Every structure is written in C-alpha cells, then in structure tokens.
Amino acid sequence: ILIDPPRSGLTNDIIDLLRLFKNIIYISCNPDSYLRDLTMLSDYEIKKIEVFDQFPNTDHLEIVSILTKKNY
C-alpha cells in the first residue's frame, strides 16, 4: 500500500489499518511526523529510504521509504 499523509502524519485509525499490510510505501514531507509514525509502526522495518530535495533553498524535503513487516 502507498501512503502520503498530510504534514500532521497518520491517525491511530490509519496506523491500525496499515498493520494489515505486509509492505508499505510511505511518503512524507515532515520528518517529525514521519519519525512519530514509524515509532507506532515498530513491527515494520525500513528496507529502503530516500530523501529528495524537491524545493532547493528551502527547509522542505520529501522522504520515501519502503517498510516491510517483520517476521511476516
């Protein structure tokens, strides 16, 4: 499943729903909410992560990661 939440990140209901999937492609524009959400998705591991500076000379960036459920 592919998710691209708002800057505020994921809600608890969405995180519960995501746990039904083996793989998640997570796109984020906010490192703080991304880290918070990853903490709640601790039963997943990061298989790949890339950071894109799509807006040079600003503080904005995009994080794209592939998460896979541990022990699936």
Report the location of each language-model feature:
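Rossmann-like S-adenosyl-L-methionine
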Residues: 1-72
